[in-house]
């Protein structure tokens, strides 16, 4: 990157470094997504390479076909983020055999409630902030979008791959 003497006076070094870092990360992310994206059309799996004009066309096809994107996430990246290190979020490489019970009352052990447990205040930093299912007691698997607990429209991912693929 070259800059003229006029540009050097208007931008601080920190903002320029931040801008360059953002450009590098965006380029790496774009290349990684292009390499990992596989499209299935008419039963034949092909690797899609998008040009600058194609992303809107591909996105429109995905919406019409009901395609849910598959996002690859590194497990170590999730462990490093503080907001994902809560007792309600567990990153695991193995697929669960069945969905976890949504409420404690669904578990037969809790229904007996013969022993009394002492309650004490513990610092629960982000507990419940990233709840997926708050009022439903059944799993919904055919949704591609939903409304989160703050009222924002969000995309529901069909599958998340963790680790090297």
UniProtKB/Swiss-Prot annotation:
It holds the Pfam family NGF. Keywords: Cleavage on pair of basic residues, Growth factor, Secreted, Signal. Transmembrane segments: none annotated. GO terms for cellular component: axon; dendrite; extracellular space; synaptic vesicle. It comes from the Eukaryota. It is found in: Secreted. GO terms for biological process: cell surface receptor protein tyrosine kinase signaling pathway; modulation of chemical synaptic transmission; negative regulation of neuron apoptotic process; nerve development; nerve growth factor signaling pathway; neuron projection morphogenesis. GO terms for molecular function: growth factor activity; nerve growth factor receptor binding. Residues 4-119 form a propeptide. Residues 1-3 form the signal peptide. Seems to promote the survival of visceral and proprioceptive sensory neurons. Belongs to the NGF-beta family. This is Neurotrophin-3. It comes from Tropidophis haetianus (Haitian dwarf boa). The lineage of its organism: Eukaryota, Metazoa, Chordata, Craniata, Vertebrata. The gene is NTF3.
